[in-house]
């Protein structure tokens, strides 16, 4: 019988941007079992809802995660609006969607850079993050912040994004597109990338469904599910698009899905800017939720489905705020994907799942 050993992977590791710890049970240089451990950056953000005015808590909700900050802000505000039975103007919905899709581009370009860095393709890492910088500049010019945008509030937006600024966003994305397409071509067609990604960390569609995998991780295994199309967080009525789905279920397929979603997000933004309404941006509400009033919403974050739940208690403070993030859904898929793989491929597989531990632990 081959000798088995346990190798600790993380929480501090050069290839991981966040503190995920795995105990890897190894036999003959292959992973037999992966046991995840989280809890290193738990901050108790949900508990803080009992001590903060629900409008003040919007700042905290946006800080659940830096990469997905605008998504968490939209999710929290939308859940509170449902609890208070507020219907925001169409322009608010459009601007939130535009910012959310910009966040998706930002997240995927950041991830592509980390993936390139993981297999030693530093030039590709620089190219990915150079393009990402253009999205951060858009955020800064329209909202004042590069990461935390602080534009959403319960009932609408704190300030408008002018039509001239929206047109500038489209111009920037049009200028970026050739470079993005060249970047995607390198990732998907270059042999040095393909050899590291093809056939690694395979998860079948059947397993993906049984493990309730979400986001690009699930769609790369053939799961045709995108909240933007099929759930109460959908905005397919605002723009025409279809979910990006691959079938191989390996690291290459996950890269394929995210690469396609970058250019798809550009198309969505361009369409939204072309038909955005001019019916105002709402504003902060003075309503107080009734005791026991509830609101919930599901949105498609860059990493997958995120669920937001709020409950009022008759005061300005919320009684409960709950978030279920995509990484918590995908951890079971991660441990499954690692079974039987070579130890050298572990960092690659973890990165293609794109875990966000800050979101997961809160």
What are these regions (language model features)?
Residues 1-362:
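Active-site bordering "gate/hinge" segments
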């Amino acid at each position: 019988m081959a000798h088995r050993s346990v190798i600790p992977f993380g929480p501090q590791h050069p290839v991981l941007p966040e503190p995920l710890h795995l105990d890897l049970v190894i036999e003959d240089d292959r992973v037999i079992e992966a046991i995840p451990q989280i809890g290193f950056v738990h901050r108790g953000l949900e508990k803080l809802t009992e001590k903060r005015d629900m409008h003040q808590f919007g700042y905290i909700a946006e800080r659940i995660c830096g990469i997905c900050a605008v998504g968490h802000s939209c999710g929290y505000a939308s859940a509170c609006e449902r609890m208070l039975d507020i219907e925001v103007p169409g322009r608010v919905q459009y601007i939130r969607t535009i910012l959310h899709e910009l966040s998706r581009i930002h997240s995927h370009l950041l991830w592509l850079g980390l993936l390139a860095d993981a297999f030693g393709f530093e030039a590709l890492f620089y190219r990915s993050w150079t393009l990402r910088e253009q999205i951060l500049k858009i955020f800064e010019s329209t909202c004042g912040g590069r990461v935390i945008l602080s534009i959403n509030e319960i009932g609408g937006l704190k300030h408008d994004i002018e039509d001239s600024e929206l047109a500038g966003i489209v111009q920037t994305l049009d200028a970026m597109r050739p470079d993005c397409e060249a970047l995607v071509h390198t990732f998907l067609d270059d042999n040095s990338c393909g050899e590291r990604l093809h056939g690694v960390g395979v998860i079948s569609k059947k397993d993906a469904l049984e493990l309730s995998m979400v986001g690009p991780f699930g769609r790369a295994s053939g799961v045709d599910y995108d909240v933007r199309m099929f759930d109460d967080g959908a905005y397919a009525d605002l723009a025409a698009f279809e979910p990006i789905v691959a079938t191989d279920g390996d690291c290459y397929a996950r890269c394929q899905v995210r690469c396609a979603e970058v250019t798809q997000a550009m198309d969505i933004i361009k369409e939204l800017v072309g038909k955005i309404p001019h019916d105002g941006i709402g504003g902060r509400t003075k309503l107080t939720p009734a005791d026991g009033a509830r609101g919930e919403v599901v949105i498609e974050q860059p990493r997958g489905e995120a669920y937001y739940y709020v409950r009022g208690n008759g005061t300005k403070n919320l009684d409960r705020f709950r978030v279920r993030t995509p990484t918590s859904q995908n951890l079971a898929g991660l441990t499954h994907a690692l079974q039987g793989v070579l130890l050298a491929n572990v960092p690659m597989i973890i990165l293609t799942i794109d875990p966000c531990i800050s979101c997961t632990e809160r």
